[in-house]
Design a protein with these regions (language model features):
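N-terminal Sec/SRP start-transfer signal
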Residues: 1-6
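Short amphipathic beta-strand/extended segments in non-transmembrane regions
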Residues: 55-118
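Membrane-interface junction motifs in transport/secretion proteins
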Residues: 27-51
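Hydrophobic secondary-structure segments that place a key small or acidic residue at a functional site
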Residues: 94-171
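Short, hydrophobic beta-strand segments
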Residues: 38-41, 83-89, 187-189
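Structural motif
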Residues: 42-45, 70-71, 133-135
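"Rare, low-scoring activations can occur
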Residues: 49, 55-67, 134-143, 150-215
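Alpha-helical transmembrane segments
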Residues: 7-35
Length: 215
């Protein structure tokens, strides 16, 4: 068999593999709704001094439903989520913590299947309670109302991908950033389904420029 023929076969197989991967990624469910959400990384100036102006300016556009925040971007990097440990059932256990605003799950359409979601009243607590994922519920034998790491488990979310598809799901909790110094530097802007996305994104850019011309 000629060398060119072998190379052609390899290229055809590679192309088929890439198409299958693309098809899989298009159909693969992350467990949250990213289609109507625009993610914007902010600088500290906006978050520290102009957060209310930022949210208020965005909501002047009728197609924008809500704005949520987090310390890191969900599902962007496997190693960007805080890893913590706790003493539980007489052993050390490790889990990942994702710090976000109280409306984050609703903006991202991550369902809470047991218990409840965060509310604004939870912001008044000295330290944040948790909403856990199914892996934490399974591995740590936890349920809504249980105590874990000196916090109360408020609810259990629907399963979703917080890291890449190549890594198995592991214990993960959502927490409000009441008790950490890190600012929330990522914003998630949810549009309704009838929004003109091009116009809405232009409004986001204009809002940012009005607050910080250097952005």
């Amino acid at each position: 068999i000629g060398f060119q023929f072998i190379v052609s076969i390899v290229l055809i197989i590679s192309a088929m593999f890439v198409r299958q991967q693309n098809r899989f990624m298009q159909k693969y469910s992350l467990g949250f709704d990213k289609d109507q959400v625009v993610v914007v990384e902010l600088n500290r100036n906006i978050m520290h001094d102009h957060k209310d102006s930022y949210v208020g300016g965005l909501k002047e556009y009728p197609g924008i439903e809500d704005v949520a925040f987090s310390v890191y971007e969900l599902s962007k990097e496997d190693d960007m989520i805080d890893l913590e440990y706790a003493r539980h059932e007489d052993k050390d256990v490790f889990f990942k913590v994702f710090y976000a605003s109280e409306n984050f799950l609703s903006v991202m359409d991550i369902q809470v299947e047991e218990g409840r979601d965060f509310t604004r009243e939870d912001l008044n607590k000295a330290q944040s309670d948790y909403i856990i994922n199914p892996a934490a519920e399974r591995d740590f034998h936890l349920h809504p109302g249980d105590r874990f790491n000196d916090r109360t488990v408020l609810g259990v979310s629907k399963d979703f991908r917080f890291n890449s598809c190549r890594i198995a799901s592991s214990p993960f909790v959502f927490a409000l950033n009441n008790d950490i110094p890190n600012p929330k530097l990522v914003s998630y802007i949810r549009f309704n389904s009838k929004t003109n996305l091009q116009e809405a994104v232009a409004h986001v850019r204009e809002t940012l420029k009005e607050i910080d011309p250097t952005f």
